[in-house]
């Protein structure tokens, strides 16, 4: 099943589903292996920088809560919103650094396709960057706006960390 049920933040009685990011991750990461190899560098930090630079060139439409394009579709359409970019980068980065846990982070008030979303790697990766702490676990943000994550934290909007594997 490519969707999972969720609780609608405004009314528990309303329907709510969101993409099953973990299942989609496993479904598409093998397809992207040849592309991932293009970002292989001397160290993880350089590979991540190359991926981030490449991803920034993909146009970002306004956030789509009622639509989700899996990684291959996002590449074909040459556009991806925050959760689509997060899953695309995760699918590529997992081929280069499978030893580190990756998570999709999103606000708990999200409905449907989460918005906004960030890809994060565990702090034990040694990567430098903006850090978010969720449930006493430090995450390094790899995609999305760190300022927006900080604003949500300051506004007391809880963030959810959904491990991809």
Where are the regions that the model predicts?
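A structural boundary/capping signal
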Residues: 1-165
